[in-house]
């Protein structure tokens, strides 16, 4: 079993396993591949044969990173932009900057090359439809800036709107899927072929 990074850490990572025996995709099909769920403010990474899934995303954004050379994938469920407060002792991975540091570290622990990562972003919706609520925009701007500072490519995004989303990554195939609202799951990106199933989205 691989390890999943828990967010309420101090300096050292604490790990927990959240593997299930199966999961159901957006079409109701049953899959036997063990999966790991990243809840709000959590970061996870795993090698080939695992499926990484975000819990539902509102203004939060799922950072889906993948190293095609090692088939190691990682997912960070980011809640807030920027860096955590200086006095914060727990929940640091809720913040974009700290979550990315954790994501790249745990992926490297699984064998990934931090310089070889490809990124997709999913989420960042204004689900409450508040006119002056900008947290979803701030999250996207913060993550985009931090990722580009590392010279890592953002291959595909599915962000904005007002409906909740979910992200799912297959580490074996290098495919990432997204679900918006109650719609069926759709493939967003293939990390190996760079194919996009829905290029007009």
Swiss-Prot record:
Under InterPro entries, the record lists:
CheD-like_sf, Chemorcpt_Glu_NH3ase_CheD, Cytotoxic_necrot_fac-like_cat
Q: Does the keyword Hydrolase apply?
A: yes
Alphabetical keyword list: Chemotaxis, Hydrolase
- Looking at the Swiss-Prot or TrEMBL record, what is one Pfam family this protein matches? CheD
What the entry lists under Gene3D superfamilies is as follows: 3.30.1330.200
Segments crossing the lipid bilayer: none
Tell me the GO BP annotations in alphabetical order.
Answer: chemotaxis
Superkingdom of the organism of origin: Bacteria
Q: Name one GO molecular function term.
A: protein-glutamine glutaminase activity
| Enzyme Commission numbers on file | 3.5.1.44
The question of whether Phosphoprotein is a record keyword is answered with no
Write down the chemical reaction(s) this protein catalyses. L-glutaminyl-[protein] + H2O = L-glutamyl-[protein] + NH4(+)
Function, please?
A: Probably deamidates glutamine residues to glutamate on methyl-accepting chemotaxis receptors (MCPs), playing an important role in chemotaxis.
UniProt record similarity statement:
Belongs to the CheD family.
| Name of the featured protein | Probable chemoreceptor glutamine deamidase CheD
Per the UniProt record, the source organism is Chlorobium luteolum (strain DSM 273 / BCRC 81028 / 2530)
Per the record, the gene is: cheD
């Amino acid at each position: 079993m691989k390890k999943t990074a828990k967010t309420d850490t101090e300096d050292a990572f604490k790990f927990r396993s959240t593997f299930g025996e199966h999961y159901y995709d957006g079409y109701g099909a049953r899959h036997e591949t063990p999966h790991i769920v990243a809840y709000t403010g959590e970061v996870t990474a795993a090698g080939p044969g695992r499926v990484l899934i975000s819990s539902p995303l509102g203004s939060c954004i799922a950072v889906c990173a993948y190293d095609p050379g090692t088939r190691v994938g990682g997912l960070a469920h980011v809640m807030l932009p920027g860096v955590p407060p200086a006095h914060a002792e727990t929940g640091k991975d809720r913040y974009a900057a700290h979550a990315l540091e954790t994501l790249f570290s745990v992926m490297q622990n699984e064998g990934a090359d931090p310089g070889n990562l490809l990124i997709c972003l999913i989420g960042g919706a204004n689900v409450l439809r508040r006119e002056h609520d900008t947290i979803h925009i701030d999250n996207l701007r913060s993550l985009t800036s931090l990722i580009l500072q590392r010279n890592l490519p953002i291959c595909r995004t599915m962000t904005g709107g007002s409906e909740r989303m979910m992200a799912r990554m297959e580490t074996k195939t290098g495919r990432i899927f997204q679900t918006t609202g109650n719609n069926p799951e759709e493939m967003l990106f293939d990390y190996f072929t760079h194919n996009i199933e829905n290029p007009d989205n």
